[in-house]
């Protein structure tokens, strides 16, 4: 069972439908016990970093997610959810993140020919093979964002070119992040979610 974190700031239903499509049992929940009992979690996110962290904190979900990560169970952050995995952000004001992956969130440079927010399809360049990236090449995925994750290269598993080289996917241990929306990226997005399914099943088997 995968729990999609419900904190009133995410595209939970579209992610749930995508997981249903690939046969991955899931539920949308903010219940601490359900989250900790899950085989893995997906942290969605749409909106601003400070408000999202405030809402996670108000519900005590920041502590729950850190406990989940410490257990070694898989986690996938999507769009803003990926950014929340990092240590901090400059969006509107300096705000601490969950600190699960080293890095800082910065605004995309507003340069001629590169609109901010970045909305639309962009090509992936795979930097490292993982269960989520092993079937990917130069496919296009769908983005909607104004900020990006500035993190050490060792945690970047895919990028896309824009006004800067945007870390498209990041990874540390069983924690993954996707800056784009897999649930809106067609078949290639489903392949990424299948990779996360593989990680959760492998982790579950090793813990039994």
From Swiss-Prot:
Its main location: cytoplasm. The gene is hisH. It catalyses: 5-[(5-phospho-1-deoxy-D-ribulos-1-ylimino)methylamino]-1-(5-phospho-beta-D-ribosyl)imidazole-4-carboxamide + L-glutamine = D-erythro-1-(imidazol-4-yl)glycerol 3-phosphate + 5-amino-1-(5-phospho-beta-D-ribosyl)imidazole-4-carboxamide + L-glutamate + H(+); L-glutamine + H2O = L-glutamate + NH4(+). GO terms for biological process: L-histidine biosynthetic process. InterPro entries: Class_I_gatase-like, GATASE, Imidazole-glycPsynth_HisH. PROSITE patterns: GATASE_TYPE_1. Pathway: Amino-acid biosynthesis; L-histidine biosynthesis; L-histidine from 5-phospho-alpha-D-ribose 1-diphosphate: step 5/9. The lineage of its organism: Bacteria, Bacillati, Bacillota, Bacilli, Bacillales. IGPS catalyzes the conversion of PRFAR and glutamine to IGP, AICAR and glutamate. The HisH subunit catalyzes the hydrolysis of glutamine to glutamate and ammonia as part of the synthesis of IGP and AICAR. The resulting ammonia molecule is channeled to the active site of HisF. Residues 1-206 form the Glutamine amidotransferase type-1 domain. Heterodimer of HisH and HisF. GO terms for cellular component: cytoplasm. This is Imidazole glycerol phosphate synthase subunit HisH. Keywords: Amino-acid biosynthesis, Cytoplasm, Glutamine amidotransferase, Histidine biosynthesis, Hydrolase, Lyase. Its EC number is 4.3.2.10, 3.5.1.2. The active site is at 79 (nucleophile), 181, 183. It is found in: Cytoplasm. It holds the Pfam family GATase. CDD domains: GATase1_IGP_Synthase. One of its GO terms (molecular function) is lyase activity.
């Amino acid at each position: 069972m995968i729990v999609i974190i419900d904190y009133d700031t995410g595209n939970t239903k579209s992610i749930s439908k995508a997981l249903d499509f690939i046969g991955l049992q899931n539920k949308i929940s903010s219940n601490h016990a359900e989250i900790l009992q899950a085989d893995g979690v997906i942290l969605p996110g749409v909106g601003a970093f400070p408000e999202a962290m405030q809402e996670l904190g108000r519900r005590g979900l920041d502590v729950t997610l850190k406990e989940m990560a410490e257990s070694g169970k898989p986690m996938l952050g999507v769009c803003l959810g990926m950014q929340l995995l990092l240590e901090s952000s400059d969006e509107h004001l300096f705000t601490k993140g969950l600190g699960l992956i080293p890095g800082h969130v910065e605004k995309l440079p507003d340069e001629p020919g590169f609109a901010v927010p970045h909305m639309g399809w962009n090509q992936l360049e795979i930097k490292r093979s993982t269960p989520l990236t092993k079937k990917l090449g130069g496919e296009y995925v769908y983005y909607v964002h104004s900020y990006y994750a500035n993190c050490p290269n060792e945690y970047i598993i895919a990028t896309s070119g824009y006004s800067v080289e945007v870390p498209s996917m990041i990874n540390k241990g069983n924690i993954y992040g996707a800056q784009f929306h897999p649930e809106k990226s067609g078949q290639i997005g489903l392949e990424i979610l299948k990779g996360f399914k593989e990680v959760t099943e492998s982790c579950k088997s090793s813990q039994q």
